[in-house]
Swiss-Prot record:
GO terms for cellular component: cytoplasm. Belongs to the FAD-dependent oxidoreductase family. The keyword Lyase does not apply. The keyword Oxidoreductase applies. Pathway: Siderophore biosynthesis. Its cofactor is 6-hydroxy-FAD. Coiled coil: none annotated. Induction: Expression is induced during iron deprivation and is regulated by the transcription factor SRE1. 6-hydroxy-FAD binds at residues 59-63, 154, 366. This is Oxidoreductase OXR1. Oxidoreductase; part of the gene cluster that mediates the biosynthesis of hydroxamate-containing siderophores that play a critical role in virulence via intracellular iron acquisition during macrophage infection.
Amino acid sequence: MLSLFYQRISTYIKLSASSLLSILPLYRPFQRRRLTMPSNEGSISSSSTTRPKDVLVVGGSYSGLAAALNLLDLCQGRSCRFAGALDPEISEPAEMRERVPVQITIVDERDGYFHLIGTPLAFASEEYALSAWRKFADIPALQTPAIKFIQGSVTRVDCERKISTIKEAGTNNEISQKYDYLVASSGLRRTWPSAPQSLNKDKYLEEVGEHIAKIKMANGGVVVIGGGAVGIEMASELKEMHPDLRVTLIHSRAKLLSSEPLPDEFRDRALELLHETGVETILGSRVIRTTQTELNGAATPSYTLSLTDGRTIKAGYVINAISKYSPTTAYLPSSVLDKEGYVKVNSALNFTDEVPNAKYHFAAGDLALWSGIKRAGRAMHHGHYVGMNIYQQLLNERFGTKPKFSEMAHAPPSMAVAVGKNTVAYGTEQGVVSGEEIAKIFFEDDLGFGICWRYLKLGEAPK
């Protein structure tokens, strides 16, 4: 599911806000509308006695962390950490960087940041899995009194009173917490193996260990069901990490990635790269039944898969990678949700006016009802804009300045899929590109973990 970067990338794509964020499979996704903001000269200066504004961020993944950290940068008088992605002429001018006291609370069901893009590799390599999950308490960028973390889930939001109800993990104690601004960035509920189901690192490592143990015992090979991005990446990473393992991918449609609005050239190239990796494929036939054979003294289990075309396939382990997901928005008023549960937003990522105090409520990332294929790069871009827009409102409240909001542009479909050592990518301007060099640009050698970590500056302690 994405990426960002430095000198090596400028040789391939012009370094700009859009290209920087395209590195997490999307190309030139957004533009920023520039408005004029009056100078703050003569306004009331910051005071240490002013009550900090409380910002509640629901979800601590790509969009939530991007919103929290960019907002904190601005409120502490610095350029936001994503400002390097912007051309100098659209970066925040110095007069915008007034200090504003802020207290940010991040609520997440997990005890840490998990690099979701790397899920296929995490489920193939225990060594990689260990680094893909970082506890919030161990992330240097979050170690500041201005950021508080609660492991738990938000169960209700009262937009009119600006009060949330939070259920703490472990104790199930309910906390009533007031806020001045809310960022809904809790993402999508993904089924296994699109994401680990564990909520703390120790359990996650057990989950991964059990899965990889079954892979190693699969004498009859592994079958991956589903030819979307998750299935393709899962199958190819298994083959890369376990080259002697027979891996077969089964997809019910004639083309891979059949649910995405992408050109056939992209789908065909993904299939070619999958075959180059050594993965076998069966297309155009659906699995209608999976039967586990009795062990009868055998050391490893065996499975028989029956297909709609009459064939039967034997396997030592079966992975159902047909992605199922839904927005995690049950805590929000139904009036701001569409029929599928996505949050209705305007171009500044505010809730639409169906709820009271809409301008104090934002949605970012996969749960926001906005155009484009949902990707981590886009989620971080959402968070960036939300952070800047909250800061603009804080300046308005504190100094009376006219807000200069950053507005999202609608984005066409774009995607990059890692296929072993290669990557195939598509954008409306670039078309379909693929190869190992493309993989280095989009994912480096760790499915984008280092790229996202550096871009979010998670390893840098607060100044």
